[in-house]
Regions:
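Alpha-helical scaffold domains
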Residues: 1-166, 189
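Low-acidity, Ser/Thr- and Arg-rich intrinsically disordered low-complexity segments
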Residues: 172-173, 177-188
Length: 189
């Protein structure tokens, strides 16, 4: 059984995999997550969430009932690692129209263009915001516009916009040189 004490250490990839294998054998992935993901010690929460990243797609689907608690965790935590890992799990879960939360959409929109945010968090927020808006084409276009505008202020936004447009099928392009500042006239929408 995995204990709080065991999750307090600094872990390597192999140790995260060992945690996952032990949780898999116990057959209680959702219970493990529910127990440790909101732990007051960020190291414990981080290691628990990291171990669960090793789950297969089918196993990960078991976490669907934790979608909204994971969303709350992502929005409320002060720890960047816990935020990134909770966003990673959210991104792997199904998002239906009934799951759309405007507070979470606002969170994603704010963090995807925040120059002080880590690039991994920015890219996950971009992808999740785009997926949340797929039910509303006008909103989806607005997310793309925000990404384009965010590229003016943040090179990370531009890099991740270029990466994700191929992954999730953005229809718009940003013809920009990576070495010169972009002017508003150089953006095509």
């Amino acid at each position: 059984m995995i204990t709080e004490e065991r999750l307090k250490g600094a872990y390597s990839e192999g140790e995260a995999l060992a945690i996952y294998n032990e949780v898999k054998q116990s057959g209680d992935l959702i219970g493990f997550c529910r127990t440790f993901m909101n732990h007051e010690d960020y190291q414990v929460a981080r290691n628990a969430l990291w171990g669960v990243t090793k789950a297969s797609k089918a196993e990960h689907a078991q976490l669907q009932p934790l979608l909204h608690p994971l969303i709350d965790l992502a929005m409320q935590t002060d720890n960047a690692s816990v935020r990134r890992l909770s966003l990673y799990h959210i991104e792997r879960l199904k998002l239906e129209e009934d799951d759309l939360r405007t507070d979470f959409l606002d969170f994603c929109l704010a963090h995807m263009v925040n120059p002080d945010e880590f690039p991994g968090i920015q890219s996950l927020c971009m992808k999740i915001a785009y997926r949340m808006c797929k039910f509303y084409p006008v909103s989806q276009g607005q997310v793309i516009d925000i990404l384009i505008i965010g590229a003016f202020f943040n090179s990370y936004s531009l890099q991740y916009y270029s990466f994700w447009k191929g992954k999730i099928g953005f229809a718009r392009t940003v013809p920009v040189s990576w070495t010169t500042p972009m002017s508003i006239a150089s953006v095509t929408v």
